[in-house]
């Protein structure tokens, strides 16, 4: 019994480390310092809002899929076909079309270019995705590779930089923030990372890995994955808070005119000199590799399952790596221009389904579909308005300034659907199915 508990604890640490790396990514390292710089003495307030809207929603996604059993079950409340369309759009837009190519571009910009200026970006991207291909080929080993090997190195580098910045701050923290509303800025920055969507594809490989190690559905799986999610959340809290504080310590030296990547590079160089730039390059490189591994593996696993195994996991890994290498060199901006509005549309209904799965898993599917329709209609109108089609009505909706204008329509449509389920005609039609379920 003690041996089983010890093994479970070890798995929690490994899976938790893997989840940390998956959500951390290379892009997210640049946001907390910039927010800390803008917020000045109110950096903790801005950071808290950012963390809740980013990692808070992402952890909700993890616990939602854990509660109902899988990522597919979270989305299936909207109906089988809508769920497949929604999941396919999420995986395509988050993984091979945007995030995976961006990992290579970020690694080159922040890790290679400052330290090895003579390396061609084309040659680097080919080498980068060749490495990702090799590390992703064994599906069941992905979580172990990330959790046991790469994440500890990543954490050592991150905490070395953060601790140096705490022990020897770079300057005084500005009394007044550079932005008008610190909390709103933090919420918008966290929400716009869309990390909650990443929980759905990441959940695929996490649950596969845990199940393959003998932790089946039930309390054992809940203990391992739930504990891992909490560990990842604590690590992300510590790292993001530390980075936000570093940004606050230079709030009297820089303004919003500096780029996000330039700010973190300037902080690292001021703290640790050229050695720090090299260490940070290693940190960013590891973050890019771990994120690319997670995204590639989860996308390949999903599409292989969608094809009912007719196309193998390894074939999809190879295809995704080749496609991402091409996109990272030839057309990332164009692909992002296509994918960004799609993500703007699908994010609100996906969040609705995550919240319902976590908070009200036994609610009638009519209610879920009603809430999804309300969120989807609003997100379509808001996206059209954002991209040049005038829909002035959406600006009058509550929470529009936060990007959360879909919340009220989702609630209203969900309540309307709940009233529909109470109609006598609907109850009579569902009575036979309910009785059959009780007998089983």
Language-model features: locations:
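Membrane-interface loop-to-helix entry segments
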Residues: 137-165, 339-351, 370-377
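Hydrophobic, membrane-embedded alpha-helices of multi-pass small-molecule transporters
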Residues: 14-24, 163-170, 179-246, 279-288, ...
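Membrane-water interface regions at transmembrane-helix termini and the short interhelical loops
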Residues: 37, 65-74, 129-150, 212-215, ...
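Membrane-helix boundary/coupling elements in multi-pass transport proteins
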Residues: 99-104, 277-308, 372
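Helix-loop-helix connectors at the membrane interface of multi-pass transporters/channels
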Residues: 35, 105-120, 211-212, 292-319
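TM-loop-TM module centered on a large, flexible mid-protein loop between adjacent transmembrane helices
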Residues: 72-73, 239-289, 305, 341-343
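Selective recognition of specific alpha-helical transmembrane segments in multi-pass small-molecule
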Residues: 56, 60, 153-164, 227-251, ...
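A generic transmembrane alpha-helix motif of multi-pass inner-membrane proteins
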Residues: 161, 168, 365-440
């Amino acid at each position: 019994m003690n041996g089983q508990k010890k093994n479970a604890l070890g798995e929690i640490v490994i899976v938790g480390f893997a989840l940390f790396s998956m959500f951390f990514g290379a892009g997210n390292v640049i946001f907390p310092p910039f927010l800390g710089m803008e917020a000045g003495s109110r950096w903790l307030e801005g950071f808290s809002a950012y963390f809740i809207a980013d990692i808070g929603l992402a952890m909700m996604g993890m616990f939602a899929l854990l509660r109902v059993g899988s990522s597919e079950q979270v989305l299936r409340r909207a109906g089988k076909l809508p769920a497949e369309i929604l999941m396919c759009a999420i995986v395509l837009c988050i993984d091979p079309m945007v995030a995976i190519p961006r990992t290579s571009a970020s690694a080159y910009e922040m890790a290679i270019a400052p330290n090895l200026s003579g390396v061609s970006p084309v040659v680097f991207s080919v080498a980068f995705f060749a490495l990702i291909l090799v590390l992703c080929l064994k599906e069941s080993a992905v979580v172990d590779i990330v959790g046991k090997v790469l994440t500890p190195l990543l954490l050592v580098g991150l905490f070395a930089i953060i601790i140096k910045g705490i022990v020897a701050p770079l300057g005084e923290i500005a009394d007044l923030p550079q932005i008008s509303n610190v909390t709103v800025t933090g919420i918008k920055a966290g929400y716009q990372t869309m990390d909650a969507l990443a929980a759905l594809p990441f959940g695929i490989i996490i649950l596969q890995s845990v199940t393959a190690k003998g932790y089946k559905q039930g309390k054992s799986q809940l203990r391992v994955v739930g504990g891992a999610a909490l560990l990842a959340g604590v690590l992300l809290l510590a790292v993001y808070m530390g980075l936000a504080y570093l940004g606050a310590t230079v709030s009297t030296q820089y303004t919003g005119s500096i780029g996000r990547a330039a700010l973190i590079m300037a902080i690292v160089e001021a703290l640790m000199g050229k050695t720090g730039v090299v260490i940070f390059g290693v940190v960013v490189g590891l973050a890019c590799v771990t994120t690319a591994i997670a995204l590639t593996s989860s996308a390949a696993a999903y599409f292989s399952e969608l094809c009912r195994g007719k196309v193998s996991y390894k074939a999809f890994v190879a295809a995704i790596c080749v496609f991402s290498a091409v996109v990272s060199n030839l057309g990332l901006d164009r692909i992002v221009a296509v994918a960004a509005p799609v993500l703007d549309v699908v994010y609100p209904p996906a969040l609705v389904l995550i919240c319902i799965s976590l908070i009200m898993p036994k609610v009638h599917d009519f209610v879920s579909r009603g809430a999804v329709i309300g969120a989807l209609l609003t997100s379509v109108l808001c996206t059209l308005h954002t991209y040049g089609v005038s829909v002035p009505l959406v600006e009058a909706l509550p929470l529009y300034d936060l990007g959360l204008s879909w919340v009220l329509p989702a609630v209203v449509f969900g309540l309307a659907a709940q009233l529909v389920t109470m109609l006598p005609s609907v109850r009579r039609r569902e009575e036979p199915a309910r009785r059959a379920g009780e007998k089983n």
